[in-house]
């Protein structure tokens, strides 16, 4: 390691210590100095981003997060920093995209999953405040409030219970009660902020100063004697460390300096002095992991657990050892053993960390099991069984076979096409469309996918959408006879339907289509339609633009614009 890199590491460690002490300004200065010495170290920018975010310097935090991603695009923590900064800036949709990008790199990262959930929730709230409030005052959150020490007393007050009941039924009423300190306290608890403690608010312990009575000349008010300040009770001193704890502490310091052999010496000494020092054994296992001595680390954890069982150690300590054991098994790709260890950790102490580990291992086990289940040959066998059932009109049985075929080979687009056809036979048109979409996604040039989707839409009397799907297929294979025939039938059905509708009914039906809504709400398109109605010669100029032509044709097909 170069001299500059060594100095940068020292400044980084100082910055980390300052951050842990919540001295964020000092942390930023340390990371500044470290970056000057080692400007290509992505971790330094990530750490400075976290410090800047804690100081509410959100734009600067975002800049550092982007730099970390630039230097190390395959590092998920860079995306976590970016997501957090974007979230604090109120750019929720961008935060959502950043979290998704990070999860592509590290699909089991619980922090990114939580950040994505927060961003999605905030995005929903930004678009639909009433929906966000409905989520905020859900039954689950009301239960939290009933058991929170700050808010539990409010639920003993009938008027407050009535308020919360009204807001639960109609979240849009929340603004009427925001001035109620009880309600704002509840809101603060749910949002994780102290709403009643604004920038200019007095401390909660401070009481309003009573107005002094005006003294009269005859009877001057005596000056009250100032009470003597009472001394704050002294905190009890921590008990002195045992010799074993001192050795363990020395081991921790050596570990922090990456002096692993020295750390093991101290941890062994700690256990020699106190055979019940489970934490020293657990810490030794951490050192062995760093040294890639995984089997030895497993044995150390098992000995620690045996001792913990013998002395009936604290459940939190046992949970830590089980977690470390699970981490080792995960490194060795022994997922079943890791699952058992993590399960035991949850049983001992169910908290955010142990729960996150369980989710991670369950996801990994499912991925492994799904991959082990893959078989192209077996998929073909199940697919052929499904085709035979389909020919006999046994559509539920056909679907079961196609489902099994997909499990065996989820990348075969033809199976989704077959299942789509079976769903259509059972009048499950939405499921048929979903399978057709998947088929098109996997193989965009497969014409059957467009035929399946268009047929389902036709059956739902969604003629306009069916025409668009057939048109997509014809762009790939312009002379496909089946697509051409289906398009003609759909045009005929659409014409017949529109001829029986009044103008008002036609508009109502067209308004259900989101694309038509968008076209009709476009001020530029409205102006173009006005120009075309007032000056038909202008139509030719406008329709030279392919985008305008496509929108215009959609309005014609929907019967909103009539020609001739």
UniProtKB/Swiss-Prot annotation:
The UniProt entry's GO biological process terms, in alphabetical order, are:
protein folding
Query: Which spans does this entry mark as compositional bias, Low complexity?
Result: 197-209
Q: Which GO terms describe its molecular function?
A: Hsp70 protein binding; Hsp90 protein binding
Protein's UniProt keywords contain Cytoplasm: yes
Domain of life (superkingdom): Eukaryota
Entry's SUPFAM superfamilies?
A: TPR-like
Which UniProt keyword terms apply here?
Cytoplasm, Nucleus, Repeat, TPR repeat
Q: Where is this region: Disordered?
A: 197-249
Q: What is this protein called?
A: Protein STIP1 homolog
What is the protein's major site of localization? cytoplasm
Indicate the segments forming the STI1 domain, all copies.
139-177, 513-552
Biased composition regions of type Pro residues, renumbered to the chain: 210-227
Q: Where in the cell does this protein reside?
A: Cytoplasm; Nucleus
Q: Which InterPro entries match?
A: STI1/HOP_DP, STI1_HS-bd, TPR-like_helical_dom_sf, TPR_rpt
UniProt KW Cytoplasm keyword: yes
TPR repeats span which residues? 8-41, 43-75, 76-109, 244-277, 279-311, 319-352, 379-412, 414-446, 447-480
Where is it found, in Gene Ontology cellular component terms? nucleus; phagocytic vesicle
């Amino acid at each position: 390691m170069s001299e500059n890199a060594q100095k940068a590491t020292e400044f980084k460690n100082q910055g980390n210590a300052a951050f842990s002490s919540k001295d964020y300004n000092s942390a930023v200065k340390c990371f500044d100095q470290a970056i000057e010495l080692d400007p290509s170290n992505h971790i330094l920018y990530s750490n400075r981003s976290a410090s800047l975010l804690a100081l509410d310097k959100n734009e600067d935090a975002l800049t550092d997060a982007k730099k970390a991603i630039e230097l190390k695009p395959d590092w998920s923590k860079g995306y976590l920093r970016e997501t957090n900064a974007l979230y604090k800036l109120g750019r929720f949709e961008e935060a959502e995209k950043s979290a998704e990008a990070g999860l592509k790199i590290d699909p089991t990262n619980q922090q990114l999953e939580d950040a994505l959930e927060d961003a999605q929730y905030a995005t929903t709230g930004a678009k639909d405040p009433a929906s966000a409030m409905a989520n905020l005052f859900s039954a689950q959150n009301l239960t939290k409030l009933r058991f929170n020490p700050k808010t539990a007393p409010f639920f003993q007050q009938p008027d407050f219970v009535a308020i919360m009941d009204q807001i639960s039924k109609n979240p849009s009423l929340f603004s009427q009660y925001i001035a109620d300190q009880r309600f704002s306290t509840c809101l603060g608890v749910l949002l994780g902020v102290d709403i009643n403690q604004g920038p200019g608010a007095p401390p909660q312990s401070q009481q309003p100063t009573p107005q002094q009575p005006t003294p009269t000349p005859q009877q001057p008010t005596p000056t009250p004697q100032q009470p003597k300040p009472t001394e704050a009770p002294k905190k009890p001193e921590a008990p002195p460390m045992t010799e074993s704890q001192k050795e363990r502490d020395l081991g921790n310091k050596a570990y922090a300096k990456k002096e692993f052999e020295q750390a093991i010496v101290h941890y062994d000494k700690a256990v020699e002095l106190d055979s019940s020092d489970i934490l020293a054994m657990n810490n030794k296992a951490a050192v062995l992991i760093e040294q890639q001595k995984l089997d030895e680390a497993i044995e150390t954890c098992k000995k620690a657990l045996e001792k913990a069982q013998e002395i009936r150690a604290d459940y939190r300590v046992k949970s830590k050892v089980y977690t470390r054991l699970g981490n080792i098994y995960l490194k060795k790709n022994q997922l079943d053993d890791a699952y058992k260890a993590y399960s035991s950790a949850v049983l001992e102490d169910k908290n955010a960390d142990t729960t996150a580990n369980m989710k991670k291992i369950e996801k990994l086990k499912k991925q492994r099991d799904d991959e082990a289940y893959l078989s192209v040959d077996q998929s073909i066998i199940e697919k052929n069984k499904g085709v035979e059932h389909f020919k006999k009109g046994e559509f539920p049985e056909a679907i079961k076979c196609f489902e099994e075929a997909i499990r065996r080979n989820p990348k075969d687009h033809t199976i989704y096409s077959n299942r789509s056809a079976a769903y259509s036979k059972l009048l499950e048109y939405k499921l048929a469309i979903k399978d057709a979409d998947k088929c098109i996604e996997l193989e965009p040039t497969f014409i059957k996918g467009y035929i399946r989707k268009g047929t389902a839409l036709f059956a739902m009397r969604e003629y306009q959408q069916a025409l668009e799907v057939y048109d997509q297929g014809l762009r790939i294979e312009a002379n496909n006879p089946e697509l051409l025939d289906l398009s003609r039938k759909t045009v005929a059905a659409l014409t017949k339907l529109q001829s029986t509708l009044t103008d008002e009914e036609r508009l109502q039906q067209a308004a259900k289509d989101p694309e038509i809504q968008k076209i009709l709400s476009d001020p530029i398109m409205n102006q173009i339609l006005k120009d075309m109605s007032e000056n038909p010669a202008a139509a030719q100029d406008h329709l030279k633009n392919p985008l305008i032509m496509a929108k215009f044709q959609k309005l014609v097909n929907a019967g909103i614009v009539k020609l001739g």
